Amino acid sequence: MRWTAGILGVLLVGLLVLPWLVRPKGGSQPAGEGPALVIITPHTEQIRFEYERAFSRWHEANFGQPVTIDWRAPGGTSEIRRLLIDQYRAAIRNGEYELVDGEVIIEPGRMGYDLLFGGGSYEHTQMRRGFVAEIDGQGVQVPISVPAGFSQDRMDAWFGENKIGNQLLYEPDQYWIGTALSGFGIIFNKDLYARAGMDTPTSFTDLTDPRLMGLVALADPRQSGSITTTFDSILNAYGWDEGWRILREMAANTRYFTSAATKPPLDIAAGEAMAGLAIDFYGRTQAQAVTSPGAPPEASRVGYIDPVGAVYIDADPISMLRGGPSPELARRFVEFCMTEQAQSLWQFSANPEQAGPEPTGPVQYELRRAPVRRVMYEQHADRFIDRVDPFAAAADVPSRGWRSAIPVMMGAFGVDSDEELQEAWAALWRLRERAAEDPAWTSVLARAEAAFYAFPTQAVVGVDGQSRALLFSEEHYDAVRDVWRDAEAAAEARIAYTRFFRDRYKEVVELEARSQPD
């Protein structure tokens, strides 16, 4: 209805222009004595509760007064990024800035948020890059975040080497600083594996086992940044050919592709799927939810693992935002996040009385996340709920830069072709069994294998103005990716790719249906 669309449009404008109207469902509001800090976050209510309580207590002990936090939780990190960019663009259009030596300066209090707390390093890096604004007829880069400004000695004391696997723990200029670590691994139902007589998974390749047809739960990489990160880690660890093969076969085993990365852990715990991919704390939290009170974590029917040497470990950062209301208070919150007390909130058991030596851990909620500081593993690992060491598990393979291909290709060969893919996968395995019994089928199998794993070509215009059909391959990846930078060309490519994959899967099914070999 038109009147409904109009109302929604007004509400959207209000959301962009008046950030103080945004409130998390069930979130806390500024109340009580002391200053207030405004934090926009994708973090859960449990994390918000523990960090607000602990920070206020720390601030009162160190600065003489408690603090309240005004949490804003409008959605996931991708949604938050879009919201912030819109608000900062509006501020530039309204002239709420000064241009000093080519840098955009926004005075404290001009913008609505002090900090972005949580989300992966990719999104926080986008905050550091910001956007390009046209000012006085020129394009000027406007970072949304600002450097935290701690001394390098302080950073070295907190982090030591600025590295985990192939990733940074903090942005070198401190536009973002990691506060926790996120792994992207495998969640599985132990009971279902036992009933099937299968060993529980230890590597990503285990999710390609044909016995898992229709039993793997995955999120849609076009909707979930976390699952894209997991798929990217597989490509990085296994390389182009083997990596894409694993992703194709994993997609062929899916029960579904969901838009919500939180759904697979729930369904796996309920026995609706045997295994899937998840962020570590989604997996561990769900395992805890189905564990009997007082039972150890290993007693849960749900398990989670980070495949050693292949898992992508990413910093979960915090960023100070340009023009926020209280920059000094925001900086204190960042400093607090790096204390051992704050780090203990991520992985210690709940301690309602806050008894025992510091750090004392959370009061109510067990967050089941990995601390970012090495000292926690060196001195306090015996107090962890989960016996984890992400520094040992992290893959040390340099990023190959293929992430942008994942939503495009998996969307085409998996999500939008799921029925055809699954039918072809089952047919391919029947052919493999047939060829194993009768070598006369070997040539037919080879053709089916080639069709199943095939990739399309892309028309690319070279510097000479000539159009060439380039195979989507490691060699031609950069050229093909450049085509996708144009929105219209990218949309046409996605349609063509989907048609290509469906035709190839149909070919596999037809080859298997033959009554005679070549």
Q: Residue ranges of each PLM-predicted region?
A:
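Extracytoplasmic ligand-binding site segments that recognize negatively charged/polar headgroups
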Residues: P42-F49, R72-P74, S78-R81, G112-A260, ...
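Hydrophobic membrane-insertion alpha-helices, especially the h-region
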Residues: A5-W20
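Mature extracytoplasmic/periplasmic domains
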Residues: L321-V397
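Long, charged, low-complexity terminal extensions
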Residues: A370-D518
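Early extracytoplasmic/lumenal segment of secretory-pathway proteins
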Residues: P19-R129, P265-L266
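Small-molecule pocket liners
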Residues: S182-G185, D232, V302, D314-I318
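A bilobed periplasmic-binding-protein/Venus flytrap-type ligand-binding module shared by bacterial periplasmic
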Residues: I187-L192, I313-P327, L345-W346
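Ligand-binding pocket segment of bilobal, Venus flytrap-like solute-binding proteins
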Residues: S233-S300, Y304, S344-L345
